């Protein structure tokens, strides 16, 4: 009788022609750094292990950390293609880099913006190529975040938005402007593509804005500490898409649970390693969204957050 562990190994080996001496290779192109994305990657690895895949035993996972540098994702994607990995797992602009590097190696998106609108897949139900995984609807999220910001800071009139337009689609920038206008907020979108751009933008904000919206992606995530430090020093309330910004000292965040997304990416990877084709795996969307509020940051900013808003929070940092 086969144990469950040996059965899992047998199934995975069968998918690759009984190559027991040469386990499949997963190329994990991490758009961020170990500091910004480490917990998410750990969730992926843990879920993959639960599904029967142990790194170094019946699978080999090659990690590459781009630390928010787009040029690095391009380089690493090319390396994985040359290495002939069996699956590439990535997120954000890493998905684009991987797609540009190969049309044949399966690509699993752990988190990406609107994959249909941005042309990566034909539809969520039938991706129509080598990309599948998790996709987010950022336009809707931008509107929701600004509504939350208005609930917390009713008198907000001027908004600065840090946006890396090199990786953020035009419709997402339009969504920020449109939602702001609907709420009678004047939005100033600041284009940032490097850490130096972030420093320059933050240096101009003191006294010039009522709040700061940070479009959360690998570049801003890699520089979250300097963003939060500068904003707090200038007494500027902040809103983000990742909870990690709030645990680092930011005011509020609203967005998907990325631990959950990366764990679900492992499930896509498992299916592909067992023989499924990306086009047969419909893309999925987040099911868990979290509102995180940092009361300590609110007090330092002199803000009083209503009980009504606090009751909506999934987590309140005292």
Specify the residue positions occupied by each region the protein language model found:
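Short hydrophobic alpha-helices and adjacent helix-cap/hinge residues
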Residues: 1-318
